[in-house]
Structures are given as structure tokens and as C-alpha cells.
């Protein structure tokens, strides 16, 4: 049994997660989170909010998971959101074609369907299931289609990402931020992709959770005011050049920007914050790297893009976060289709005076002549360059109708004007987090086995703030004189907002092992000494050491242990084993 099987078996058995619809045989690409998994997921999301909503001051919004067709036409999902697919001609099994050549090409995403099929043929790749011949590769759109209302007049789609809701709400968000850049919006929620062959547990799902931030910035200024906070962080970077050599480089964030490895300070800042967040939820630093997209795999509109990748036992390096400079693509795409103005007026620090040549129509003549059409005609004339004002007459087209205007009715003057700012279409920096993938990574990176007393102890070494249970309250025996004081301690933890578990079933050793397996950092045992002197034992999950503390101080001590304000060995009197 490899580590992936060990983790997924533990997750099912202990109530973290399991395949959906088990009663009816299940469906690939869907997973349910059990009691412990739902708690773990919520804590991962809450720490994300602590970083990006509280730490960065970004506004959290919530948008529908169904979108109208126009949204995805503008975003490009209708025409370009697809994966390459191939089908076995014998058994009819369907595969994602680029996954079949991963052992040949490190990043097959950049290849066209034709190139992938050629590699399949050249390398004699056959159906993994039956060895049959594979069909030609074709593109399969990954969006789930539905209808909004009865009939098919108003098609809709389950959103493939949370990001579009933030772009659609740009004008309202801009107003919320008092018409000034930069600002950010975040959303945590469900997204949907009709994956071709989801076979990797929660790593590849058809319904999954995302946490995304869209940071709207002035395209002329890509420096970050808080860059000094992260510039000395050392990251393991797998840049395009490093990928050519096949060797990860470790360097500071500041050096990466100075050398032009990461495009600019703002992008580097969010790469660094992503690193800090992933460590805060329990991702192993030694199994974490940031890989830069190669030029041929990066979206044509992107300026730079980095993926946070983690090393998993069975699956190798897997992307769990993407951090991209998407330039102004998203807002310009929605501007083009919606005709809405998604630009921002950015004030200069000081007004500047500029001279320019202005075209001035003679409205005393044009007004009476064209009446209601005069303003539109004048606007069209003013938009013309001086070079276009040649000849005795000027031809212009307004609303599909052509007009001839005498040249003498248009004058050209040099004017000086005060310019207080200019309109810009913001660029977008997008850190996009796959919550389900992060959760599985935390499970696998926290999983440890060690021999203890002729048996193998399994322990999930969650960080204290991540564990789905903060503390377990365990009466030494299921007897009233021990259960009642234990229950009072349990109730006090609950009143203080801490997640406590009360357990009387089985021997105390068995209960310790059970809490090791689910990652509970501390177990409090109420024994007969408690009845004599009011003290209880506290057991540390990772070291299995025990101390005695006063029962009345249990909540404060556990809280300080979890926050790191108190060291376990100094929190009470050691218990001799």
C-alpha cells in the first residue's frame, strides 16, 4: 500500500472524505467531506481569509455558480475552455490525451490536438485498459451546460472558475473602493469542470472549491508598497531557464525580481504570500516549489504566471495554486461585449499642462443645419486628426450615414490645457487556490507512521490551528465520578469557542491512537488524581509526552499551546512514563 492509499483509506475510515453517491455506485469526480474533512476544509479556508481578507484588506463577495452565456462568451470559455480527448476504438474508454504522454513531455498542455495525436502514434501508445488503438485527438469543452428557465432560449453554464463574478462586478467594486486603484476582491466557492477522466481522488474533481483573489492595479505601476516585508523570503523557484537545466534554484524574492525571473514586485509579492499561506496550513516546505509557465504554455494575454506545485507520493508534482499577471485581458474582453466602461480615471500627483491641436467645428452653422444630429457629427469631426482634414470637403460617417462637411466649417487651433489624470484599464493579478488539492496535500504531508510498542502508530501531524479537533477530553474510565468532571471541562472548552471532542469508548491507549490518527494535538485525561488535587494530564500528540496541569486552567493553557505562546515542556509538571 503506497502513501496515497494509506491517506485515502484513513480519510474514509476516520470521516475526512469519501466518494459521493456511494449508495448508488458513485460517480467519478465527486467527493463528500465528512465531519472531520468539513472542519479541516473550513479551517484551511478561514486561514486563507486571514491572509487575503484581513491581511490584504480585500473585499469578499459571493456570486451565483450559474452564469449566463454572454459571460463565458466574453471570457473565452465558450470557445477555448477545452481539454484534448481520445477514445479507445475497442473498449470505448475515454482518456485525456495529454495525460497519456506525460512520461514523454514534461508539460504537454502547450501541444495542439494534432501534435498530441502524432506523439501517441510515434510512441505506439495504446489504450491503458485493453491495449486497443486510440482515436484521433479532439477538443472537448469542459463546461456544464444548463438552461435558465423553461425551454432552451436562455442557455447558462455552471461556472468553471469564481473569477468571472469579480470581473462582472468591477464597476460596483470600484465604487466600493472610492474609485481608486489598487484594490482586490476575493471569492471562495464551488466551480465546475466536466473533466474527461477524473481518476485521482480530490486532486481532479468535476465539482471543486476555489479561493481566488483578483487584484486590480494601475498598469503603469507594478511596484508593491509592502514588498520589503517579503523580499528576503527564500523560495524554491523552477523558472523557465531552470526547467531547461532540470534543476530548481533557491533564492530570495528580492533577487528573483532583480534578475527578472519574476516579472515585477506585485506578482512576486503574491508568490511570497502564497508561500507563507501554504506553510501556515501545513504544506511541507521541502516538497513545495514554484514553477514558471513556459512561453508556449502561458496564455497569450498573460505577462507572467507561476504555479505553486507540491510533491505527492504517487502523483508527483501537482499544481495547487496559480499566480498570474493576466494584464487587462479580462476587463477589455467584457468591455468589448457588454459595451460598458470598465476603465478607471487615475489622478496625477500634480496636474500637468500640455499643448495639443484641437479640431473645432463651427456649431453656429452645423447646429441649425443638422439639428439633433449636430452633436454626433461634431464629435466625429473632433475625433479626426489634422491629417484627415484635406480638400474642400470632409466625409464622415455617423450611425451608418455619410455626411459631407465643407472644410471651411472646421478650424484647427493649438490649445493649452490642464491634465489632471488619465483613464486606464486596470491589469489583474490573480492568485487562484485549489482548496481540495491543498486539503489533500495537507493530509499527505502530515501523515506519519512510527513503530511504538510492537505496533505501527499512525499520526496526522497537523499544525495546531489546522487540526479539525483542538483537544480531546478523555475520562480514564467510563465511570460517573470521572465522566462528570470531564464533562465540565469539555463544556468549558465549547463555551470558549474551541473544537473539543468527548470520548469514553475503549481503553485510554486506544483513544490516544484514535486521536493521533485524526490529528488531535492534545488529549486531556481526567483520572482519579483529578478527584484528589484538581489536576489533569495533557498528552502531546507528536512527542506522546504528558504533563499535569490544574483543570481550572486547561482552556487557557491549551489555547496558549496552540498559539505558540507556551512551550509544552514548560506548561506543567512532567509525568513520568
Swiss-Prot record:
Localisation: Cytoplasm
Alphabetized Gene3D superfamilies for the sequence: 3.30.40.230, 3.30.720.200, Anticodon-binding domain, Bira Bifunctional Protein, Domain 2
Annotated keywords: Aminoacyl-tRNA synthetase, ATP-binding, Cytoplasm, Ligase, Nucleotide-binding, Protein biosynthesis
EC number: 6.1.1.14
Residue sites binding substrate per the record: 96, 161, 208-212, 430-434
Reaction(s) this enzyme catalyzes, per UniProt: tRNA(Gly) + glycine + ATP = glycyl-tRNA(Gly) + AMP + diphosphate
Task of the protein: Catalyzes the attachment of glycine to tRNA(Gly).
Protein name from the UniProt record: Glycine--tRNA ligase
Gene name, Swiss-Prot/TrEMBL: glyS
Amino acid at each position: 500500500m503506497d502513501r496515497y492509499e494509506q491517506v485515502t483509506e484513513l480519510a474514509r475510515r476516520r470521516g475526512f472524505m469519501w466518494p459521493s453517491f456511494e449508495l448508488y455506485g458513485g460517480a467519478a469526480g465527486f467527493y463528500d467531506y465528512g465531519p472531520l474533512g468539513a472542519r479541516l476544509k473550513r479551517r484551511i479556508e478561514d486561514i486563507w481569509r486571514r491572509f487575503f481578507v484581513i491581511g490584504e484588506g480585500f473585499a469578499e463577495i459571493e456570486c451565483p455558480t450559474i452564469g449566463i452565456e454572454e459571460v463565458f462568451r466574453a471570457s473565452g470559455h465558450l470557445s477555448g475552455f477545452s481539454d484534448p480527448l481520445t477514445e479507445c476504438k475497442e473498449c470505448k474508454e475515454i482518456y485525456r490525451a495529454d495525460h497519456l504522454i506525460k512520461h514523454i513531455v514534461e508539460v504537454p498542455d502547450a501541444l495542439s490536438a494534432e501534435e498530441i495525436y502524432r506523439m501517441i502514434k510515434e510512441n505506439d501508445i495504446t489504450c491503458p485498459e485493453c491495449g486497443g488503438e486510440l482515436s484521433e485527438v479532439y477538443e472537448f469543452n469542459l463546461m456544464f451546460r444548463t438552461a435558465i428557465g423553461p425551454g432552451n432560449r436562455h442557455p447558462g453554464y455552471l461556472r468553471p472558475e469564481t473569477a468571472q463574478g469579480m470581473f462582472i462586478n468591477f464597476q460596483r467594486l470600484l465604487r466600493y473602493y472610492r474609485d481608486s486603484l489598487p484594490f482586490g476582491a476575493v471569492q471562495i466557492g464551488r466551480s465546475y469542470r466536466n473533466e474527461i477522466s477524473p481518476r485521482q481522488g480530490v486532486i481532479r474533481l468535476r465539482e471543486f472549491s476555489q479561493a481566488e483573489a483578483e487584484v486590480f492595479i494601475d498598469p503603469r505601476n507594478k511596484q508593491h508598497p509592502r514588498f520589503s516585508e517579503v523580499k528576503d523570503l527564500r523560495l524554491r523557484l523552477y523558472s523557465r531557464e531552470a526547467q531547461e537545466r532540470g534543476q530548481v534554484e533557491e533564492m530570495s524574492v528580492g533577487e528573483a525580481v532583480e534578475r527578472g525571473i519574476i516579472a515585477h514586485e506585485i506578482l512576486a509579492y503574491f508568490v511570497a504570500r502564497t508561500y507563507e499561506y501554504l506553510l501556515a496550513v501545513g504544506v511541507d516546505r521541502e516538497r513545495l516549489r514554484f514553477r514558471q509557465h513556459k512561453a508556449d504554455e502561458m496564455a497569450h494575454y498573460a505577462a507572467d504566471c507561476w504555479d505553486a506545485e507540491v510533491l505527492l507520493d504517487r502523483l508527483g508534482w501537482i499544481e495547487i495554486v496559480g499566480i498570474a499577471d493576466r494584464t487587462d485581458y479580462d476587463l477589455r474582453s467584457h468591455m468589448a461585449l457588454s459595451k460598458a466602461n470598465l476603465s478607471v480615471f487615475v489622478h496625477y500627483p500634480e496636474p500637468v499642462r500640455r499643448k495639443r491641436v484641437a479640431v473645432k467645428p463651427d456649431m453656429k452653422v452645423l447646429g441649425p443645419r443638422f439639428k439633433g444630429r449636430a452633436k454626433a457629427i461634431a464629435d466625429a469631426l473632433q475625433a479626426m486628426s489634422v491629417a484627415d482634414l484635406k480638400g474642400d470637403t470632409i466625409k464622415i460617417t455617423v450611425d451608418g450615414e455619410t455626411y459631407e462637411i465643407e472644410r471651411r466649417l472646421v478650424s484647427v487651433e493649438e490649445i493649452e490645457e490642464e491634465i489632471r489624470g488619465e483613464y486606464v484599464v486596470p491589469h489583474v493579478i490573480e492568485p487562484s487556490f485549489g482548496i481540495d488539492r491543498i486539503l489533500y496535500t495537507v493530509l499527505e504531508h502530515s501523515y506519519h507512521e512510527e513503530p511504538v510498542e510492537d505496533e505501527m502508530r499512525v499520526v496526522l501531524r497537523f499544525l495546531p490551528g489546522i487540526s479539525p479537533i483542538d483537544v480531546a477530553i478523555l475520562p480514564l474510565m467510563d465511570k460517573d465520578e470521572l465522566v462528570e468532571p470531564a464533562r465540565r471541562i469539555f463544556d468549558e472548552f465549547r463555551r470558549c469557542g474551541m473544537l473539543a471532542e468527548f470520548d469514553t469508548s475503549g481503553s485510554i491507549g486506544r483513544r490516544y491512537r484514535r486521536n493521533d490518527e485524526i490529528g488531535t494535538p492534545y488529549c486531556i485525561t481526567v483520572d482519579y488524581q483529578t478527584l484528589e488535587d484538581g489536576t489533569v494530564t495533557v498528552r502531546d500528540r507528536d512527542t506522546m509526552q504528558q504533563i499535569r496541569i490544574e483543570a481550572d486552567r486547561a482552556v487557557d493553557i491549551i489555547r496558549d499551546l496552540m498559539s505558540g505562546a507556551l512551550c509544552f515542556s514548560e506548561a506543567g509538571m512532567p509525568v513520568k512514563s
